[in-house]
Amino acid sequence: MFTKIHPTKRKILDKALELFNENGLANVTLRQIALELEISQGNLNYHFKKKEELIEFLYFELFQQGEENEREIRNFTIWDFLQSYIAGMEQLYTYRFLLLDMEQVFREVPSLRDHFISISKFRDEAYTKAYLLGAACGVFKPLKKEELKIWVETIRLLGDSWITHAHRYGITEKAAVFENHLGYFEHWLRNYYMETTKAELNKR
């Protein structure tokens, strides 16, 4: 979907992403993006007629990257799981306006709310698969069906809210945002480790 993007179109997307992240979605116009790039608004409108088109493109670009990251997982150790989770955090942080301004995103492009809800099922299936694989490999404790459902719902909630939670309390620098989330994420996840997993982590 996103191969062979015209260089000017890519520059517009990158600048829009930068401004959306820095200033907030509601505070950025197509005119501002054009001024920052030192191009005419007509040139910008040739590629994106409306702000909604920019938002939609960036939204689906993020989800495409997430799918590619998922396909790259080959094995399952606790290190594989944590590295994959952090890679997902990096991707989300790059497109953080989508989380920080999620309701505004859905107001600007209502169809994205429907898409976001529809993919929740697939996200839950991916989380379930990851946990079951981890349990089969001796990383996680076996869970009953209802316990696994709660685990999946919790990790999805954490994934949707970690950036907004940090910003709400004035934590905005990237390293601090990551440290803030990973601290309580790893503390929560530790409750599901096998003793051998805990011992392996304690060696590091």
Annotate each language-model stretch with its function:
Residues K11, K15, L19-L58:
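Helix-turn-helix
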Residues L100-M102, H115, L143:
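Short, hydrophobic secondary-structure boundary micro-motifs
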Residues L132, L158-R204:
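C-terminal peripheral helix-coil segments that are non-catalytic and often amphipathic
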Residues E70-F97:
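Hydrophobic alpha-helical connector segments
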Residues S111-C137, K149-T164, G183-H187:
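Amphipathic alpha-helical packing segments from all-alpha helical-bundle domains
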